[in-house]
Amino acid sequence: MVRLPLLLSGIALLPALAAAQERAPAEPDRHGPAPDAEMAGDEDIVVTGQRPPGSVIGDIAPELVLSPADIRTYGVSSITDLIAELGPQTTSGRGGRPVVLLNGKRISSFAEIRDIPTEAILRAEILPEEVALKYGYRADQKVVNIVLRPRFRTTTAELTGAAPTEGGQSSTSAESSLLRINKEGRFNLALKYQRSSALYEDERDIVADTPRRPYDVTGNITAPVYGDEIDPALSALAGQPVTAAGVPAAAAQDAQPLTAFNRPINTTDTGRYRTLLPQTDSVSMNAVLNRTIFGDVSATVNGTLSYDESDSAQGLATASIRLPGESPFSPFAGETRLYRYLDEIDPRTQQSKTVTGHLGFTLSGAAKGWQWNATGNYDRTEIRTRTRNGVDIADFQAGIDALDPTLNPFAPIPAALMGSPLIDRARSVEGVGNIQLVANGTLARLPAGPVSATVKLGGEFNDLDAHSTRAGMMTDSDLSRDIASGQISLDLPLASRKRGFIGPLGELSANVNLAYDRLSDFGGLTTLGYGLNWTPIPAIRLIASVTEDENAPTMQQLGNPTIATSGVRIFDYVRGETVDVTRISGGNPTLQADDRRVFKLGATIRPFTGNDLTLSADYVNSRVRDAVAAFPTPTAAIEAAFPDRFVRDASGQLVSVDSRPINFTRQNSEELRWGINFSKQLSSPPAGAGNRPMLRELARDAGDGPPAERPAGSDADRPRGAGFGPGGGGFGRGPGGRGTRMQFAVYHTVHLREEILVRPDGPMLDLLDGDAIGSTGGQPRHEVEAQAGLTHNGLGARLSAAWRSGTDVNGGPDGSDSLHFSSLTTINLRFFADLGQQAKLVSAVPFLRGSRLTLSVTNLFNERMRVRDADGITPVSYQPDYLDPLGRSIRISFRKLFFPPRPSGPRP
């Protein structure tokens, strides 16, 4: 962590370095201004006594508000990138992903807005989980509200190239989007293509593991029972018992004497036949059309289509050949076994192809004081997996057994004797459709304020058709699920200082919510929630809530096709060794629904008036019965609880693991997460009318009229007060992105309790003290996320850092052989330059107008987790390059916004 403050200090020098260059006249942001009233959306507008346009339903104020100037400090291109960058701020202690709203309204899916450029955003708000209830969502996810400019028009193109500094792999992507926003509605079309090359084991510093059996390209000889003596005569030559012997290279040409086999076993480095990362290709198209129909109903239609392909190499095919003692090519007294890699055929591979289609619609309107929203979606996903495991050598083995003198077992297998390829196939087709209707309005008025209600009705159908062929055995799975759902949420005001009712308490309200889902395959599932929202003084808000709900396993967890993947490298905690196993994955039709109870207590504080400083803290306590989970890492405790999931050979070596999902009897967790957000304008652009001609030109470029003049001392120049009242919150001042601005955030999560009762009769796993369910150790007690950003006249730098404390995992039957997983600090750094804001550069090269150049470094110091056993040795499967194959990588992107042609004629 000592590197973090040093790096922040380096970033702090950026304004001084930028100020040393020749100053150009201040220039506004060239990325699509808004209409007159919004002053290009860059100057903050403080609305007193009323809520700003696009605000969410209810009286819960945002935890964080980002202005266009704040968003520019992130240096990201689209709403997708922005949401990813806001991960620390949108993480929920309850585990759900954030809900995303558009202009304070529901959308059919994130695909509606994912490709919108960040320049089109007027405001972004992050709100607590309780706001999700007001929109018919579950209270386990935070809410992000994106408010767009009323008018915006541009075409965007971006080219990106990335590669790790250690080489071996590269990624390229190209994307383009078209966006039109005006009073008639919105149209967005986006195309993307991305390709990443494969990364092989021999391209990293990896020590190959000894295979379970002594396979080699030339071959090795053992007794029929592995571990027994091959031949007493060979042992006499070696002067010790010989259980494995290398085949001499000359044996591929003709028969060799026994003395030629008195040699060490042969080994083959298969790193160039095994991928750490597969080759991937992805192409997608996304189209969105929004219009107003029937006079006052907003209608949106969205369609997406994507294709993804992944190809991985899993090592050389193997052959275990029985060699009779009478064979003319065998010098041994009795039967032996030959282990060979078959390099004369293609390596073992796995290919996956996924085709995904999506259609969605959204209707929004208002009637008789109630706001209503209807959404519908249909998604179809087809996944095909093809695994090549080698070839059938039964004909070749038959010839060897028949003592055919023309068949040399040590020579390449003749093509005529190679049988059909051993190929496993799996195919799944999933279709999901849903329609939801949500209405929100006022039921009654109490002295403390209106009683508001949110009602949701919905229906959903799911179909999953899966087929798989493994080792010649076919399995079919055809599942369907229909869901009828309803939810009601009531907000009850209890006290209000603004309304003069029990004023000393401040603003106090209660929420009660109830949901019921009827599943065709699981019956009825209920959700009950209740909580309090209290603002005793404007600078402090407290929220307490309890949610009790039931959740069914997903269709994929129940019915995905069974797939066997050979050559998967894992660490066997029982024997303390790394082994290559066959991993069985797929669905588990015996899973049960879980039952959970979550208590949350949260506080948000804005302590200083006129400063964009926010402090937040959340305590979350959850209990889950029959928790559905992926199969955990194979520790001794897990194998004792699920012995039927593990297969070992006669020597006790692990050969197969069934990793299909399971139910845990009970899971308990407690955590405290606190954080700080700070944003400040360090310097402002030169004042005066010098910027006005440029703003007018920029407004024309985006299809808007010229921005209105603002007198000095207007609301845009006044400092804003802290608090949670209407219009209160928000970040950022500074038109056009000029001047200097900084942003900082840090979040610290302390895990107080992480326990899992695997089965009713045990064992109880303590993930904070010696147990694990994942492959990267137990649950770190401490996790820290930090961000810092600085922009100066279009030049910016952004740093993000993450740190997690180390853990220990007990191994061996008695838990004495432990593994230590080190702490890990990763730092990412991004520099970006909005070239369009550099007036002299644009004058010299007009093409650079509206362009941005970005240089990103991921894992700046090339840090990787270190894993060591009790003797200080790193197990083969936990070598650093296995845990993080890429390491430090560099990404360069060039992005260009193409504005529409300027209108002809004299300028006003």
Provide a role label for each language-model segment:
Residues I107, I116-T160, Y200, P711-G725:
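A beta-strand signature from Gram-negative outer-membrane beta-barrel systems
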Residues E125, F152-L178, T268-P278:
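Short strand-turn segments of transmembrane beta-barrel domains in outer membranes
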Residues R623, P706-S714, R718-G729, R738, ...:
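C-terminal beta-signal and adjacent terminal beta-strands/loops
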Residues S468, Q556-L558, I563-D572, T582, ...:
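Outer-membrane beta-barrel domain signature, especially the mid-to-C-terminal portions
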Residues R30-M39, I45-G95, I107-I116, V131-R138, ...:
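N-terminal plug
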Residues L199, E203, D209-P214, V247-T280, ...:
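Surface-exposed, low-complexity loop segments enriched in small/polar and acidic residues
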Residues E130, G161-T165, T172, N182, ...:
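Transmembrane beta-strands of outer-membrane beta-barrel pores
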